[in-house]
Every structure is written in structure tokens, then in C-alpha cells.
């Protein structure tokens, strides 16, 4: 029991120290992913979050190294075969350029994806870009578009992401 408490304490401390030293942002996202197969579009939702324990800012340009964990729900297309649910763990590099109330961003992620229903684990790469709107000193809403390169389930999609913390 003490090991788990110590581990949680260390994780919280490391997270707090990284937030205090750099003030990175954390993000919570809800996305829609689509795959095209047999001339149909399959849509599913992705829930998750990411945080950037390491990052730099030079004037209006911010570079960060986010870690993202997400869960994608399964969905059923009209012909009856399911898009498998999946769990993702990815790390990446991200650049964000700030204007007065608007920011543009581009990210690249690489990681692993677990498909429990088909008992497969595979690598996935993802390119993401979009626009964000600052709603205050520590809050912004981003609208990302992404394409995921995956041997099992390549997908294109978009969503809404809320960023909190740091100087957004």
C-alpha cells in the first residue's frame, strides 16, 4: 500500500514541478474519427487528455513535447461490421504560434494502440493541426484536425479540445 501512495505522490509532485517550472498546458479532448472502407464512413468518438511535461516558449512561438492517452469508442456502420474500440498512448512534439486571441498549432505523435476486441497492439503515427482561441490567461479552446497512420485503422477526424494551465 505504501508503494502505491509513494508512486502517486511522486507522480503528483513531478506533475506539479513540471507545471510550476514551465507552466505547460493540459488538454481534454472529445474527437470524432472516421475511417473509409467499402465506400462508407465509420464514425467513433475519442475521449482522453494530454499533458506537456516539457516545453519552451520564445516570444509568440511555443514548442512542447506532449504525452497523450485516449480511448476511442467502437461504432457500427450500416453494413454491420464494427469499428473496434481502442486505447492509445502516444508521445509527440508540438508547435504553437500565438496571435492576440488566436493560435495556430501543428503536432506529430507516435505511439502504440491496443485493440482489445481483435487482440492486436500496433504502432500508430498521427499528424494534427488546427486553430485555437484564447478565452483567458489560462484557458483556450482548440479545434484540431488529424490524420492517423495505422495498419489496422487509418483515420481522419476533428474535434474540440480545451486547454488549461500555463499561458494559453
Tell where the protein language model's regions lie, with residue ranges:
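Short glycine/proline- and aromatic-enriched beta-strand/turn motifs that initiate or cap beta-hairpins
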Residues: 18-79, 157, 161-168
Amino acid at each position: 500500500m505504501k508503494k502505491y501512495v509513494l508512486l502517486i505522490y511522486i507522480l503528483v509532485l513531478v506533475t506539479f514541478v513540471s507545471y510550476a517550472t514551465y507552466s505547460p498546458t493540459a488538454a481534454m479532448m472529445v474527437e470524432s474519427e472516421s475511417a473509409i472502407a467499402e465506400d462508407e464512413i465509420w464514425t467513433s468518438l475519442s475521449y482522453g487528455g494530454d499533458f506537456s511535461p516539457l516545453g519552451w516558449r520564445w516570444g509568440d512561438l511555443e514548442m512542447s513535447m506532449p504525452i497523450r492517452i485516449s480511448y476511442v469508442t467502437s461504432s457500427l456502420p450500416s453494413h454491420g461490421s464494427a469499428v473496434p474500440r481502442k486505447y492509445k498512448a502516444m508521445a509527440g512534439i508540438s508547435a504553437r504560434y500565438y496571435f492576440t486571441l488566436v493560435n495556430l498549432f501543428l503536432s506529430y505523435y507516435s505511439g502504440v494502440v491496443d485493440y482489445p476486441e481483435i487482440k492486436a497492439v500496433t504502432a500508430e503515427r498521427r499528424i494534427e493541426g488546427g486553430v485555437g482561441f484564447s478565452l483567458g490567461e489560462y484557458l483556450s479552446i482548440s479545434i484540431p484536425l488529424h490524420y492517423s497512420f495505422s495498419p489496422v485503422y487509418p483515420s481522419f477526424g476533428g474535434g474540440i479540445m480545451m486547454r488549461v494551465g500555463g499561458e494559453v
